[in-house]
Structure formats: C-alpha cells, structure tokens
Amino acid sequence: MQGIVVIKCGGSTMDQLPDSFFQAIAGLQAQGQEIVIVHGGGPAINSMLDRVQITPQFVDGLRVTCEDTLRVVEMVLCGSINKALVKRLTQAGAKAWGVSGIDGQTLLATKTPKPLGWVGEIKKADMTIPKAILEQGFVPVIAPLSVSEDGTETYNVNADVAAGAIAAALSAEKLIMVTDVPGIMQPQPDGTKAVVSATSAEEIQEMIREEIITGGMIPKVQAALDALGQGVEQVVICRGTAEDLLGVCAGQAVGTTVRMNVNYA
C-alpha cells in the first residue's frame, strides 16, 4: 500500500473546493490510499468574530487568540467547518470521521511565549486516534485545536503547523497543502509572477528574507520545513482541484514541491 498522504485544506479555500475534489479523495480511498485531512477555517472564524464584534488580529500570519476569540475558534472549527467537510466527503462517497486535536490529546501543546494569546506550541502529536480511524477504513478529518497535558487548557494552533506535526508523526509520504494560489509565486522580470515548481529549505529562507514569501504563506513553508526535518518525504503546495490532487498523488510535477534539498542537475 502507498504511504499515508496528509492533506491540509486552508480556510480560504473551503468554500471554493469543488465536488470533484472530494470525489477524487473518495476515489483514492477506494483504491486503498490512506488519507488524513487537517483543516483551517480562517474566513469563517473572521466572519463569526465580526458578528460578535471582535476584531481579528494577526502577527506574521498567525492569529492572535484572546479567550473570547478562542471560544469562537473552537465553535467554528470543531462545529461547523469540521462537520461540513465530513458531510462533503460522505456525499462524494468517502468514509470520513471528524475529530479535533483535543480528542485523546491528539495534539498536546503548551502556551506559546510569543504575544499571540491562547495559541499553543505542539509538544507531541499522538496518532493513536487517527491511526485507529484509518484502520477502520475512514478518513480522519482533524480540526487544529490542541490541549494541555493536564487537560485544563485549550489552545489554538495554526492549521499549517498542525498539519506538519501530524504528517511527521504519521511518517507520511506526502503532505499536500491546498491553498487558493497554485503554489509559491515568484516575481518575473516582465512584472508577472510564476509558480516555483521546486524549492529547498535554503531557498525558502532566502525567499522569506527577500519578502517573496510573505503573510500566510510563511507559516505554510515553515510547517513544510518542520515536517521535512522530521521525516516527511515531500511537501507540495497546490490548488484545491481534483486535477492537482490526483497529479500530486501520481507523482506528477504540480504546484510547488518542497524538499530539504533540490537537485537541479
């Protein structure tokens, strides 16, 4: 059987994902491919925060989470977003099971020292529950919330970071980060932008310094590098289409492929 594939679905892509994307997942599952989905929910969270008159704040692409924001994040991620994804997968013919990083202390975290409020730094990703779900023939759909070791505190975790930690803990073959852009975009001499088809850890650090990679793409590539450093073979940043997903799983050159080192020879 092929190695595990972890798919991270960005919040900005959620409403744009076509039925064919979920049908592709169902098809892969039917072929024996083990798939784990980790999802965000940024726009839906921002919409709910707006309704309760809380202004969203971000630092380097990471959400600042006060106690009131945390309650909204938990409600939106574990409630509406997680179950909406499970429903869409079910409608497409897949078998899916929704959980969060809180369940079974799947994502064990401590509060970050950074000025981000109730945001956690993952100390351990326990894959007991996701593996049990996979063994039963389901796709685990994981909301990126985490819990303290004593179970008393809940922390928000950036979905890219959570996906990277989960992929590493599962020794996944691929981590696919689905976004609303076709990959890392690099400015060209004629003023246009082109997709970076392949890149390395060193090149990514250079693109961050040169501000080619900015905003929400920063935690994506940092999570990618963390996952690669912990044994994940390949990270791909691509669009949420059936064609891109199936292409990546088939080993085709799609989006931006990130490896620790890239041989251009």
From Swiss-Prot:
Q: Which residues bind substrate?
A: 41-42, 63, 156
**Its Gene Ontology biological processes?**
arginine biosynthetic process via ornithine; L-arginine biosynthetic process
Q: What does this protein do?
A: Catalyzes the ATP-dependent phosphorylation of N-acetyl-L-glutamate.
Pathway note: Amino-acid biosynthesis; L-arginine biosynthesis; N(2)-acetyl-L-ornithine from L-glutamate: step 2/4
Cystine residue pairs = none
> Could you say which EC number(s) this protein's record lists?
2.7.2.8
Instruction: Tell me which Pfam families the record gives.
Output: AA_kinase
Query: Site (Transition state stabilizer): which residue positions?
Result: 8, 220
**Name assigned to this protein:** Acetylglutamate kinase
Species assigned in the record: Brevibacillus brevis (strain 47 / JCM 6285 / NBRC 100599)
- Which family does the record claim for this protein? Belongs to the acetylglutamate kinase family. ArgB subfamily.
Localization: Cytoplasm
Catalysed reactions listed for this entry: N-acetyl-L-glutamate + ATP = N-acetyl-L-glutamyl 5-phosphate + ADP
The domain of life for this entry's organism is Bacteria
Provide one Gene Ontology cellular component: cytoplasm
